[in-house]
Design a protein with these regions (language model features):
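N-terminal, positively charged/glycine-rich alpha-helical extensions of SAM-dependent methyltransferases
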Residues: 1-22
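Conserved alpha-helix/loop element of class I SAM-dependent methyltransferases that forms part
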Residues: 33-50
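Class I SAM-dependent methyltransferase SAM/SAH-binding core
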Residues: 54-55, 59-112
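A short acidic, Gly/Pro-enriched loop at the edge of an enzyme's catalytic core
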Residues: 113-123
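A short SAM/SAH-binding and catalytic strip from SAM-dependent methyltransferases
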Residues: 122-136
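A short glycine-rich, Lys/Arg-flanked "PGG" loop and its adjoining helix->strand segment in the class I
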Residues: 138-150
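C-terminal alpha-helical "lid/dimerization" subdomain adjacent to the S-adenosyl-L-methionine
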Residues: 157-203, 210-211
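Core SAM-dependent methyltransferase catalytic element
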Residues: 203-205, 211-233
Length: 233
């Protein structure tokens, strides 16, 4: 079952990502193959069963499909600021015939969207938090943390800058090129990468596991929220 909602007026940030939506899948495959998808799904088979799942900045829906397969019967809320990205996610879900759960699509800018408090036992933000400058990132994490149920899991996959050379130089060059491209084509607000760890820790989340890939450029995280969910392992 699929439901949709649109909240608020589209921002420049939302509208600009619409143009990339039809091309995002082939661009990802051309530049990274299946590496990003492996990061998105790194912990899906390890985390406890989730009943209420929040996917923010989901984009073209590849993690959404896998969550529907892994957590059948769960309720999923998929939020994205780009209507065209949401359309891609809907199409992918229908094509994979994975809609065996309740999926609600919400067209909203996360900076202006207020989720239900203490509701979701799984939050996922894959290749999304890198879109924000520092003050925006702090607001986004604070807002999403309110939505986390006690003991919730927070999965995130993203880029990072390794601490050691020559990996550090390589990652800096790649990220510089990426930010130039996305700032030019999408009016991305961030000029550089801001690690979310500090803000997650402030909200009571603790890093449970981290996997790195691609010479340290990519990482997949499993964070755990404060409190007990009753089914954490």
């Amino acid at each position: 079952m699929v439901a949709s909602a649109s909240l608020g007026s589209p921002s420049l940030f939302a509208v600009s990502f619409d143009a990339l939506a039809p091309h995002y899948r082939w661009m990802e495959f051309l530049l990274a193959g299946e590496k990003l998808q492996r990061c998105r799904t790194a912990f899906l088979d390890d985390i406890p069963a989730a009943r209420n799942i929040l996917l923010v900045g989901e984009g073209h829906g590849r993690c959404l499909v896998e969550c529907c397969r892994r957590f059948q019967g769960a309720r999923l809320v998929c939020v994205d600021a780009s209507e065209q990205m949401l359309a891609q996610a809907r199409h992918r879900l229908a094509a994979q015939r994975a809609a065996t759960t309740m999926v609600e699509f919400i067209h909203a800018d996360v900076l202006n969207w207020s989720p239900s408090a203490r509701t979701f036992d799984l939050i996922a933000t894959n290749f999304f938090l890198d879109c924000f400058c520092r003050d925006q990132l702090e607001r986004v994490i604070c807002r999403l943390a309110i939505a986390a149920a006690p003991g919730a899991s927070w999965l995130l996959a993203d880029f990072q800058i390794p601490s050691r050379e020559p990996r550090r130089i390589r990652s800096r060059l790649i990220l510089w090129a990426m930010y130039v491209f996305f700032r030019t084509t999408t009016r991305l607000p961030a000029k550089r990468l801001t690690p979310p760890d500090l803000f997650l820790n402030r909200e009571g989340f603790r890093l449970h596991r981290r996997i790195e890939a691609e010479w340290g450029l990519l990482h997949s995280d499993w964070w755990r929220g404060p409190g007990e969910s009753g089914n954490l392992t």
